A protein has these predicted regions:
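Membrane-anchoring hydrophobic helices of lipid-metabolizing enzymes
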Residues: 1-38, 71-76, 82-83, 228
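Short, flexible loop segments at the rims of nucleotide/cofactor-binding pockets, characterized by
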Residues: 9-17, 63, 82-88, 127-129, ...
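Short acidic/polar alpha-helix capping motifs at helix-coil junctions
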Residues: 14, 38-40, 58-61, 102-105, ...
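A conditional alpha-helix N-cap/helix-loop micro-motif detector
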Residues: 15-22, 41, 67, 88-89, ...
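Conserved beta-strand termini and adjacent loop/short-helix elements that scaffold enzyme active sites
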Residues: 20-22, 61-63, 88, 167-169, ...
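Well-ordered alpha-helical segments embedded in enzymatic catalytic cores
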Residues: 24, 43-46, 94
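Non-catalytic C-terminal accessory region of glycerolipid acyltransferases
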Residues: 26-30, 53, 80, 92-233
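Catalytic core of membrane glycerolipid acyltransferases/transacylases, capturing the structured
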Residues: 30-89, 116-126
Length: 233
């Protein structure tokens, strides 16, 4: 599917990734800044479809790959339909640029993979019955900048074809904590996986490390490690 995107037309991408409640979601978002809190479910690279008809900055956040060739290829794919891209360790720059210019923006964040050690914004949550570490940037960016948060419920129709619906997790104004926003994200992703387990990318080795090991290493390098909750709020 990703290889097909090298030559796929915008019309074909919209045919393969049909967003059923786009008009309703656009009405809710209006001119607000917002976060697309995605997961490795279905063909997540197809989220580039959003940039076709929405011409404000849609910033896809990524982790640079170890292979320079693959990294260039994936950046090309993500930019083809108008998406901007920003490495996780340099995300603050484009965010502040858009905030200063008062230009609307969307951030595409995928938080269901293991955070890297260079990312201090980590949070433990119970996920699929196990203590699991998540990148906590969804909650922190949402609260710091008053950004709405949506996730995407994806269903496979046939090979390489999906339909999806945006689900609002946070309206940008509700008086809840960063952690509660993350709880909603984790719960939504788990529900989607339990409903359609075959669509999730299980190869990310989510439970390679245990909380005790992370805490020990975090202490050794002087980072503050979040505690593992007994259960999500």
């Amino acid at each position: 599917d990703v290889v097909d995107m090298t030559s796929m037309s915008p019309r074909e991408l919209k045919r393969r990734m049909r967003v059923e409640n786009m008009e309703q979601t656009d009405s809710e978002i209006g001119s607000s800044n917002w976060i697309a809190a995605l997961a490795h479910i279905g063909e997540w690279e197809y989220f580039s479809v959003y940039s076709i008809d929405h011409h404000y900055p849609n910033i896809g956040v990524y982790h640079p790959l170890s292979s320079k060739v693959m990294n260039r290829f994936m950046l090309y794919i993500r930019r083809r339909f108008g998406m901007e891209v920003a490495a996780m360790n340099s995300l603050a720059r484009p965010v502040m640029k858009n905030l200063k210019s008062r230009q609307q923006m969307a951030l595409g964040l995928i938080a269901d993979q293991r955070p890297r050690w260079v990312e201090s914004d980590r949070i433990w949550r119970t996920f699929l019955g196990q203590p699991t570490l998540f990148f906590g940037g969804i909650g922190s960016y949402a609260k710091k900048f008053g950004m709405m948060v949506y996730t995407l419920d994806i269903e496979k129709i046939k090979p390489s074809h999906f339909r999806c619906n945006f689900i609002q997790l946070y309206d940008g104004r509700e008086d809840i904590s960063e952690q509660e926003i993350m709880d909603r994200y984790v719960a939504a992703v788990e529900q989607m996986i339990r409903r359609r387990p075959e669509l999730w990318l299980w190869s990310h080795r989510r439970w390679k490390h245990k909380p005790e090991a992370y805490a020990a290493i975090a202490g050794a390098v002087g980072q503050k490690e979040s505690k593992t909750p007994e259960k999500n709020a």
